[in-house]
């Protein structure tokens, strides 16, 4: 929970213990605290530790810019009825991967007479219900064709398994602020993933 960052940060500063955080809902100031902790310990942050989501993010980073030229993009995410934040941290992370310079205005749902869709917007829709562990789909609507990229978590076990794998790969790293991509996909660590 974001409210626990201060005591956690004090502990990390005191001990130099490596940190893996998957907490979503941090403010930009709190993210700066995590980055600063990287000066005294190995710190890894990701809004989602699923390998599938990490791969989806890479796909969006690599192919998103060419798709945005000719396609309208909409993002739909689904989670259980107890999820507190919307859109989810993963949805925001995927939107950032697709549009890192925020050229698209992010529209949280639409309602009423809102007029024609602008080319410079990305609709983001959050559905909540039942026990859905997490689903994220990005739709690319073009002229006479639609492309979609999806990830569905059948259970929350994948997040724990990914965090454990990340912890194994973070072990022995020098102090620094690391991303999941750096840990999972760096050439030095690729062999260790097997």
Summary of predicted features, one role per range:
Residues 1-2, 23-24, 49, 80, ...:
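Short loop or secondary-structure boundary microenvironments that flank
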Residues 6-9, 49, 157-160, 164:
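Hydrophobic alpha-helical segments
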Residues 18-19, 48, 80, 113:
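A short, structure-level motif marking secondary-structure boundaries and short turns
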Residues 45-53, 80-87:
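Short, surface-exposed loop/turn motifs that are enriched in glycine and acidic residues
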Residues 68-194:
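C-terminal substrate-binding/catalytic lobe of Rossmann-fold NAD(P)-dependent oxidoreductases
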């Amino acid at each position: 929970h974001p409210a626990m960052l201060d005591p956690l940060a004090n502990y990390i500063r005191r001990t130099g213990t490596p940190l893996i955080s998957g907490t979503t809902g941090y403010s930009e100031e709190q993210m700066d605290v995590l980055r600063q902790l990287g000066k005294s310990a190995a710190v890894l942050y990701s809004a989602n530790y699923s390998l599938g989501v990490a791969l989806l993010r890479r796909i969006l980073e690599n192919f998103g810019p060419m798709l945005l030229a000719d396609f309208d993009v909409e993002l739909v995410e689904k989670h259980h009825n107890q999820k507190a934040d919307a859109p989810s941290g993963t949805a925001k992370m995927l939107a950032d991967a697709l549009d890192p310079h925020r050229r698209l205005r992010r529209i949280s749902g639409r309602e009423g007479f809102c007029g024609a869709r602008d080319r410079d917007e990305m609709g983001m829709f959050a559905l909540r219900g039942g026990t859905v562990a997490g689903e994220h789909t990005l739709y690319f609507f073009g002229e006479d064709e639609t492309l979609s990229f999806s990830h569905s978590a059948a259970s929350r076990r994948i997040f724990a398994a990914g965090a454990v794998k990340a912890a194994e790969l973070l072990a022995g790293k020098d102090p620094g602020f690391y991303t999941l991509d750096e840990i999972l996909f760096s050439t030095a660590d690729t062999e260790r993933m097997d």
